[in-house]
Amino acid sequence: MALALGGGGVRGYAHLGVLWVLEEAGIPIRGLAGSSAGALAACAWAFGHKDPWKVHQAVFDKEVANLRRAGNLRLLARLFSALRRQALADTAKVAEGLKRLFGEARLEDSPIPLAIQAADLLTGEAVVLRQGPAWKAVLASAAIPGLFPPVAWEGRLLVDGDVAEKVPVRAAKALFPKVVAVDVSNPPPNEPPKTALEAVLLAGEASRRRLKELALQGADLVLSLDPPFPIDTFDHEKLPLVYTLGQKRAQEKLREIQALSRLRLKDLPHLLAPRPPRPA
C-alpha cells in the first residue's frame, strides 16, 4: 500500500509514529506521498531517519518557534514590518538543517517511491515532485505562504503543498492503487469568532477543511490523528504527544490496515489505471 501523509506542522511527527507501527507489524510500504509536514516525514522515513527527535533537532529553528510565543502586539508588529518583504521568517537555518539531514539524497533514489507535493504559488496547482534533491523538495512543500519565502523550482515558485491538497491522496494513488491517508488536522473550532479577522481566517479554514474531506474520499482507509485539543503548528513541546498519538491511532486501525494490505489488486478493479488496448 501507499500512504498519503498530510500537513500539520508539529503534528506531522505523528506520521513517524504511524510508520513505526506498520513496520513493526511487517506491513510493506510501496509508496509515500507527503505534503508539508507530511513531506518531511515521508522523506525522513524513506531515507532511514526514523527517530522523530533527531529529525526535529535537524530542522528546528528558534526564530520560527518564537512566533508562537510572541504576544499579539509583537506578532502584529512583525506582520506589518513584513509587508514589504517576501516572507515573515527566513528559511536559511531550516534549509541548512534539511541539507544536513538528507545530504545529497535525491527523490528518485529513494528505497521507497516518493511523491512530494507542493503548490504553484501563481496558479494554486498541485505540483508533485518525483525527482530532485530531497532537502529542497521538503523545503518547497513546507513553504507556508507569507511565513516562508517560496522556493524556485524549474521555473515555478513553489509553496506549501497544503495550498493545493492537504492530504495528497491523488499523488499516493499514482504510486500504488491501495492508499491509507493519514490526516493530522486539528479538530474544528467549537467557538464563534471574536473579531473580523478571526471570521475571515475561520472561513478560509472551513473551505480548506471541505476540500480535504473531498480528497479523503479517494483513500481506501483514513487514519485521523484526532488530538484531544488543538495543537499549534509550531508547538514543538507537543512532539512526544503527537508521536505517541500517531502510534496509538495506527494500532487502533491495525486490523483494517492489515486487511487492506492483504487485499489483492485484482479485487480492486475500480482503482487500477486502465491498460492500453492490445494491438490487433
Mark where each language-model region is.
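Active-site-adjacent alpha/beta core region of enzyme catalytic domains
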Residues: 71-189, 221-223, 228-229, 233-260
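Short, basic, helix/turn surface patches
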Residues: 55-68, 205-220, 255-256
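Patatin-like phospholipase
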Residues: 1-4, 9-94, 98, 130-139, ...
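Alpha-helical membrane-targeting segments
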Residues: 65-89, 189-208, 267-276
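Catalytic domains of lipid- and phosphate-ester/thioester hydrolases
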Residues: 1-23, 27-30, 41-46, 174-177, ...
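Short, hinge-like loop/turn segments at secondary-structure boundaries
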Residues: 48-51, 196-201, 240-241
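Helix-centered, glycine/charged polyanion-binding patches within enzymatic domains
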Residues: 178-223
